[in-house]
């Protein structure tokens, strides 16, 4: 481990404002809003600086008290459909109309959650599945194939016979190569980067995806059902910059067997029981401190369709996270596509049939792992699961556990 603590991305809400009447102050979206909340009267006073800020409008928008030209100084203005009235979008409205799920919610100061950042009707599950051939995978030193399929995705550029891309050399071993972004990936990651710019300071851009389809196996005679899950772990940051961030996106297939729950319109289930997957966080060290305070020992997010959870790597340093299935039977569950977007600093070039790591000097060939190297890397991986300290991987590991990293990345050539 390194005793030096590199600068991390920080969550910053100073540029996000909600205008909401006092009557809405107990609404969960207003109460948990990521940013400052002011009343229409405060807003009308002109005391709030709107320059380059994101503004969410609620309440009566029919009068002149909604800001007029003052809102032109804002970077973005959203009208929250369910919490507003009097806004006539068809009459040349210049602000974007959004649903409750698109409003950012604060999660204990360690992340920001959007319950429906992407509209389920856009069928991201189908689009992503059509643009890529998902691969079988194993984890770390486990010989069995996991109950999910996946693929690494990142922009791939061709320079003559060379293919340039980014590597995530973690313990997930895929049967095929990294693939270039498809059109849907590009749109998703561009939207996430735009949003991240309003949530974080000093952060690296999102540029890499691990997409995984979580398969549930029905019970048969002589075989128990199996529901997709992943045990508690921290992401391995060997190929990530310290100021990186992460975006957990969720898309579902086969939601038609579930219905919206009365107590949460974004949740889907049967007879009051949720059929959706949960993302559970637990502190690695109970005494950990964050921004001078004590973060919660644990918390859980329901992964709603089209949801996004944004967090800095400091949250990954403090917490492990686990994927937990619904208590419903496997036959009732939808199929989930977990679409995790990260920031990678490791760059590579594939040429002459080999993958090379880009370094300060000449590119270095990606070597085959040695038993000693694998043992040391696994030791550090286990340590990153246990400690909230920074893990310094250095440049001691010129190999990958993922056999796909030794293959030429697949490129979406145009024409």
Segments and roles (model prediction):
Residues 2-415:
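Non-heme Fe(II) oxygenase metal-center motifs and adjacent flexible, charged/small-residue loops
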